[in-house]
Amino acid sequence: FLNFYNKLNEITTLKDISIETLVDFIVALIPAAILGAVIFGWYAALILTITTAAAILLEFLWNLIFKKPQTLGLLSAAATGLLLGMCLPPTVPFWVAILISFIAILTKQIFLLIKQAPLNYIALARVALVIIFPAIMTKFVTPFSLDAISAATPLASIYGDAASATTVKEAFFGIHGGCIGETSVFFLLIGGVYLIIKRIID
């Protein structure tokens, strides 16, 4: 999905993007997003809502201040916000969800102004928060847990306690610690296959 967003990074005007493409991208994200909300609970769903709403609002305010048309940019912002939320751990404070949206939308607008995209603005926003708030951005919890029990990701398990290692089945279906929308290979593949069928990616 970040590879698809690299294509959006290269576009200097939203006139080159169709509504159908953005809608297809959002639809492709939904299976993994729903799974994240199911296994990590209502707060994960709230984080996804906050990042999406914040991205749309920030894009709207930017367009309003600089007198730009409120067109496809808002749909692009919705896709950006949803993907940002999926890249966050399910335990982050709500203000982190707002901050990552602010960084991403601001970076995106700067790239559009200079008509260059040297970096992926979504990845840049996430990396910035990992550097600034490493403890917050690397705190993962056990799925379906009512309490915030720390849990290792599959990659961390490889280098940690063998007893806590995630099984292949758990890793494939996403039943392990991780970011909200990044745990399940299966549900991400569903989205990827959908984009291939729609000929958005190849």
Feature names for model-found ranges:
Residues Q116-L189:
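Long hydrophobic alpha-helical segments that form multi-pass transmembrane helix bundles
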Residues L2, I65, P69-G73, T91-I98, ...:
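Non-transmembrane, aqueous-exposed alpha-helical and coiled segments at domain scale
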Residues I26, T49-T52, I56, F60-W62, ...:
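A membrane-topology feature that recognizes alpha-helical transmembrane segments
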Residues A28-L35, A55, E59, A77-G85, ...:
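Hydrophobic, membrane-inserted alpha-helices
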Residues G41-A54, T91-L99, I175-V185:
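Structural signature of hydrophobic alpha-helical transmembrane segments
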